[in-house]
Amino acid sequence: MMRINSSCVLQSTTSLNARVLPLIGRVGTLELSSGQPLVFKTTTPKQQDVLRTSTVKAIGFAGSRIFVKTERGTQYTFEFQ
């Protein structure tokens, strides 16, 4: 399992879920492991949001970016800052 504790930003997603879209651009922690759900947690002074996806199918890295595809076909792009 890979855990990124800070300064990880959700850059983009193919998800159209109304609960996911507001998380784009937010900084949080990322827990990622192939064959397990992706977990992205963000915290603001007012609330904490947790994104938990379906099972991760593929993980890719390019520079400071992480590309994730779930078994349902949804894609997520994260960036270290």
Predicted regions and their residues:
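N-terminal non-globular leader segments, chiefly Sec-dependent signal peptides
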Residues: 1-63
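Short, compact, well-ordered microdomains
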Residues: 57-81
